[in-house]
From Swiss-Prot:
Transmembrane segments: none annotated. This is Trehalose-2-sulfate acyltransferase PapA2. InterPro entries: CAT-like_dom_sf, Condensatn. Gene3D superfamilies: Chloramphenicol acetyltransferase-like domain, Nonribosomal peptide synthetase, condensation domain. Keywords: Acyltransferase, Cell wall biogenesis/degradation, Lipid biosynthesis, Lipid metabolism, Transferase. It comes from Mycobacterium bovis (strain ATCC BAA-935 / AF2122/97). Pfam families: Condensation. It catalyses: 2-O-sulfo-alpha,alpha-trehalose + hexadecanoyl-CoA = 2-O-sulfo-2'-O-hexadecanoyl-alpha,alpha-trehalose + CoA. The gene is papA2.
Length: 468
């Protein structure tokens, strides 16, 4: 199993620190990189604009994906150097950097020859845990080298860390790092040749296809109409967390909370209940959230957006970049029955996956004023299901590497929830604004949701009545 926590909670074992930084020559090549006609993806453009706006307001938004894992013995620096550089040269998502040439237009610069990309190791002496956390959190998305890799060498083991701008990657990077850095390193130190990998896909190609696809959309396109209808049912935007979150006009850092929902046996019984209802585990996850919201707010319809990977082709599955999209989910819960909620939730999720290829930002661009659509407001709610009981994530989750994922804990305006299924348990992790009102609301939501999971698994869930 791997854990998800905030970076401020990380206290690594003492040891010497070696970090891989972009070489001066590579930085010079990046500065000289010509302008590319490839547009940023919608995800990248939205992220860059949010980052610029936060900086202008003196706010510090989360922008990194940070991972660590442990390995026994002393690090073979030469082997690790090979693995890291091979990874960076292999994936074109690391080959570009961006700048604003006016208020809104974003320009991409691309290094033409991957061989010009090189990171070199440097030792950092006498760095405290606080200094190390600050060091890992420094990459920002408007610099080319918005990534850091390093190791902390202790007496009998070392900790590897990677800090990569979300601009370049999405959660699927977990499996990529496991293969291309951990397994590559292990092969090399074991005396084997470098692992043979299939050709990587090009994220640039995805950006071009996405731009062409979204440019062809109109307000009459079926996928756009479905987004407009969903937003219209949520006050013209994306769904809001249903319970009070305090004063969100005041910046709050993010707080992360993880709770166990079910053990392995309960998870198996819960899955059986989902199948009996005509759904999969994922449909049951959204059904439990819907029924919890009904208990807490007396609602008759549950709306939420969930993240999903939009990779579909074999080439895309070999491509590193930011492919994550949003799927709108609607679940009527007036009956208070788990079976009907799970079945409808599964249908809503499955039938809505094609909407993940339509960024909500593009819908807002197309919408006429009379539609009443507007950007998400502070307190919007995003819920995700992560199944680490099956490949490829199970390989990482079931390893003995002590694999950890870190959130930076910077300013948080929304509620992000991940239901995580592992081989031996199912957990929920929630990131939310760190204030007493939001903390109480999230705790109440988790308690209601956990009760429904357990009662469903135990076969004791009767028809739920609001407020019960």
């Amino acid at each position: 199993m791997f854990s998800i926590t905030t970076l401020r909670d990380w206290t690594p074992d003492p040891g010497s620190i070696i970090c891989w930084h972009a070489s001066p020559t590579a930085k010079a090549k990046a500065r000289q990189a010509p302008i590319s006609e490839v547009p940023p993806s919608y995800q990248q453009a939205q992220h860059l604009r949010r980052y610029r706006d936060h900086v202008a307001r003196g706010l510090d938004m989360s922008r990194l994906m940070i991972f660590t894992w442990d390995l026994p013995g002393r690090c073979n620096i030469r082997a690790m150097n090979y693995a890291i550089n091979a990874h960076l040269r292999r994936h074109d998502t690391y080959h570009s950097w961006f700048e604003f040439d006016n208020a809104e237009h974003i320009v991409r610069h691309t290094i033409a020859d991957p061989a010009d990309i090189e990171v070199v190791q440097a030792e950092h002496q006498n760095m405290t845990s606080a200094e190390l956390r600050h060091h890992i959190a420094t990459p920002q998305p408007l610099q080319w080298d918005c990534f850091l890799f390093g190791i902390i060498q202790s007496d009998d083991h070392f900790t590897f860390y990677a800090s990569i701008a979300h601009l370049c990657v999405d959660p699927m990077i977990v499996g990529v790092l496991f293969i291309e850095i951990h397994m590559m390193y292990s092969a090399l130190v074991g005396g084997d040749p470098p692992i043979e990998l299939p050709p990587a896909g090009r994220y640039d190609d995805h950006c071009v296809r996405q731009y062409a696809d979204t440019a062809a959309l109109t307000l009459d396109s079926a996928r756009v109409r479905r987004w407009v209808e969903f937003a219209a049912n949520n006050d013209g935007t994306l769904p809001h967390f249903p319970l009070p979150l305090g004063d969100l006009s005041v910046p709050h850092t993010g707080k992360l909370l993880t709770e166990t929902l079910m053990d392995e046996q309960q998870g198996e019984r819960f899955e059986a209940a989902c199948v009996a209802a005509g759904a999969r585990f994922s449909g049951g996850v959204f059904a439990c959230a819907a029924l919890a919201e009904r208990e807490l707010t007396n609602c008759e319809t549950f709306d939420v957006v969930t993240t999903t990977d939009t990779r579909r082709t074999p080439t895309e599955l070999r491509t590193t970049g930011w492919f994550t999209g949003l799927v709108p989910i609607t679940v009527p819960v007036a009956s208070g029955l788990f079976d009907s909620a799970a079945r409808v939730a599964q249908i809503s999720f499955d039938s809505g996956k094609d909407l993940a290829t339509v960024p909500f930002d593009r819908v807002l661009e197309l919408a006429r004023p009379e539609t009443g659509l507007r950007p998400p407001r502070p307190g919007n709610f995003v819920m995700s299901f992560l199944d680490a009981s099956i490949a490829p994530l199970s390989t990482v989750a079931n390893s003995d590497l002590n694999f950890r994922i870190y959130d930076e804990g910077r300013v948080s305006h929304q509620v992000s929830m991940w239901v995580n299924r592992y081989q031996h348990q199912t957990t929920v992790t929630v990131l939310f604004p760190d204030n007493p009102i939001a903390s109480e609301s999230v705790a109440n939501y988790i308690a209601a949701m956990k009760s429904i999971y357990i009662r469903t698994a135990d076969g004791t869930l009767a028809i739920l009545k609001p407020g019960t």
